[in-house]
């Protein structure tokens, strides 16, 4: 009788362990699938932006591709053309209007970062090239604040906080 009770107890423990393992696998797979679904639009935007920039502007090498979301949304592509000139290409997400800027004709990312820090930015999270009120800008993200620095003059255009 004791043998039967021990066998039933072991069987119950085995079933419990199997059930917990299956539950863990299902929850982990669901989480990974949701992460994959969340990243898909961003990856699609990056590849589409890079492809359009190479197709219409002669961009040969894309170094940085981002999605800029300001008053309007743009694919922001930084790279080099065949003459190895550094370019910034902005492609309107909705209308696919293309703007091309030579990076040597404005301030650098480092200068935009320095201007933002002068105006109170802490640790810099991300710098994205964009367009605000028909002017090219560097968008510097620091914590919950966004500093918009004019690409041509280096002046702070706007500071936005979340």
Q: What is the predicted function of each stretch?
A:
Residues 53, 70-96, 110-162:
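Conserved histidines in hydrophobic membrane contexts and catalytic metal-binding motifs
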Residues 1-10:
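N-terminal Lys/Arg-rich, disordered targeting/topogenic segments
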Residues 32-65, 100-132:
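Short, non-transmembrane alpha-helical segments in secretory-pathway proteins
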Residues 15-33:
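Hydrophobic membrane-insertion alpha-helices, especially the h-region
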Residues 29, 33, 92-99:
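Acidic/histidine-rich, surface-exposed loop or edge segments in extracytoplasmic proteins
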């Amino acid at each position: 009788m004791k043998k039967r009770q021990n066998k039933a107890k072991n069987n119950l423990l085995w079933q419990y362990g199997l059930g917990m393992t299956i539950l863990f696998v299902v929850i982990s797979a669901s989480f990974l699938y949701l992460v994959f679904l969340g990243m898909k639009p961003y990856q699609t935007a990056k590849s589409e932006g890079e492809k359009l920039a190479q197709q219409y502007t002669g961009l040969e090498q894309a170094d940085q591709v981002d999605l800029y979301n300001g008053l309007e949304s743009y694919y922001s592509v930084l790279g080099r053309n065949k003459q190895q000139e550094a370019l910034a290409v902005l492609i309107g997400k909705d209308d696919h209007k293309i703007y091309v800027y030579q990076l040597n004709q404005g301030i650098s990312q480092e200068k935009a970062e320095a201007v933002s820090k002068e105006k109170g930015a802490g640790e810099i999270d991300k710098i994205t090239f964009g367009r605000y009120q028909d002017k090219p800008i560097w968008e510097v993200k620091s914590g919950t604040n966004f500093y918009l620095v004019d690409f041509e003059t280096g002046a702070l255009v706007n500071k936005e906080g979340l």
